[in-house]
Amino acid sequence: MSLCVFALIASEFMPVSLLTPMAAELQVSEGMVGQGIAISGLFAVLTSLSVSTLAGSMNRRTLLLGLTTLMAVSGALVALAPGYMVFMTGRALIGVVIGGFWSMSAATAMRLVPASQVPRALAIFNGGNALATVVAAPLGSYLGSVIGWRGAFFCLVPVALLALAWQWVSLPAMKAERPTGAAGNVFTIFTAFKSAPVAWGMAACGSFFMGQFVLFTYIRPFLETVTGIGAATVSLVLLVIGVAGFAGTLLIGRFLGTGLYRTLVVIPALMAAIAAALLPAGAWFAAVVVLLGMWGLLGTSAPVGWWSWIAKAMPHDAEAGGGLMVAVVQTSIAVGSTLGGVLFDSAGSRGTFMVAAAVLAVSSVLAFVTARITSRTT
């Protein structure tokens, strides 16, 4: 499962490191290529809200194997895309995999291991996420410069097939535990918003991911045009972001146990400051590396905090909570990358980064409100 997460995260965000060459070959703007992340987010939302209903009584092992197969198909479609529409079709398919897999991840972990080992299982799942964050962007950028962006995407296909073979051998049969529609009904899932802490928390979570991807989706064009570095150096900067993010994932657990809400307030506030600081420091390479390293440290570790929050906010309905979280996160990523694309094409990096800073600041405020409301209702 961790290998599958690695391939999934690498597939989802590979375009971030390859925007420039992809845009040139597909003969569209960098903003339009960035919409490949937006469309994957849209289809992830639709899938997360409906996967349990559509799967019905299907054995969950079969469903997971099918999703992993679809991930390999998506990678091949993108790598072989003759034009923009086929590229977007491949990105839509990876969105289906994202929504289906992540909405089932917590429930799957609960069925694979004893209750006492569920947190450890989820941590192992996230290990694949952290590893992909470390290597996907810089490796994608490097491979893109050596074998082209198509070759970089095609390299994900054997990884997905390896994950499929591993799951085929290791996953036990997992019968559907609920009647059709019990867990996947859209209206059932959205009743969670009747809880004020959940509603405010989801708003804070959504604005965090929106602000993050307004900026991060277009970091390569910023590095090339403002900082003035080439593809090889871009790969090194992305590696710094990834390594810092991996370190952040390892470190954040020390803060969540005693200061969950404080952590969720501070992280977006610091990232807003970083987004604003990148503008005056953009031409200074050393400063950009330090700032983006801090961005990676904070941004990659934050999802661990938000998944810990949803487990605390909805402890008795992991599947509904997981589906709702995926829907909110992926909608926010789609909106953020779309907004970032529009801003980058019309206002350049300055407008893009300032909006990202503002949205992240809003996330910090909403997280603070969530903490206050939660303390009053418990």
Feature-to-residue mapping (PLM):
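Helix-loop-helix hairpin linking two adjacent transmembrane segments in secondary transporters
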Residues: 84-86, 115-116, 123-172
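Paired small-residue
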Residues: 74, 85-94, 286-294
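Conserved MFS/SLC helix-loop-helix module at the cytosolic interface between two early adjacent transmembrane helices
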Residues: 46-82
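Cytoplasmic helix-loop-helix junction between adjacent transmembrane helices
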Residues: 90-130
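Helix-to-loop junctions at the C-terminal end of transmembrane segments
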Residues: 47-59, 248-260, 344-345
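Helix-breaking motifs and short loop linkers at transmembrane-helix boundaries and internal kinks
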Residues: 27, 59, 80-86, 228, ...
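C-terminal transmembrane helical hairpin of 12-TM major facilitator-type secondary transporters
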Residues: 262-305
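A late C-terminal transmembrane helix in Major Facilitator Superfamily
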Residues: 313-349, 356
